Amino acid sequence: MWFKNKYKLVTENPYNKKKLNGLGMIIYDEWNDSFRIIMQHKGIVHLFLNYSLGWKCSDYTFLECLPLLNTLEIIDIHSKGIKSIEKQYKLVTLSLNIPNGYGINYKVFSDLKSVFCYGKKYNASLFSCKSIENLYIDELKIGDKHAINQLINLRELTIANSNITSLSFLRNLKYLNSLAIINCKRIQSFIDISELNNL
């Protein structure tokens, strides 16, 4: 059969090994519409796409035609058509390790809880998505012009490889119980961390 060893059905996240609520799928090959049929037949609600595992895609517009997903995690060197992800408005977990994924409107994801993304460009819709509880933002290169302080429901926050200089925004994040600051060499003071009572 054409799809032998080209995908795998999983019941846990392949990266953090957390148990999934529903069935997941890892695709090890180039996108083919037969994958969509399999997803519909099996009731797939979690999708993992990683080019280092064999995933290939030149255009992500196929996301518009998929069943509604709870989880979408993409690691790729291509991002053409990635705005089609906005049709997946039921996403709870979204991880985009891709180039040029900055134009996505996060406001469409009313149930979104967990996000991994890059922050080289400002995206107001990301910082207005108050449902987010877990945010990992890499390459946040917009200095202190972000609006992380608006994400008042954050429980877990990781900022990596950033040029931020101030942590004053932490004062607004009353529910934060996990904080990681990685390779952010321009931060001038860490005193604001003392305001976080739940760490």
Q: Positions of the model-derived regions?
A:
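Concave beta-strand-loop units of leucine-rich repeat
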Residues: 2-37, 43-64, 68-165, 172-188, ...
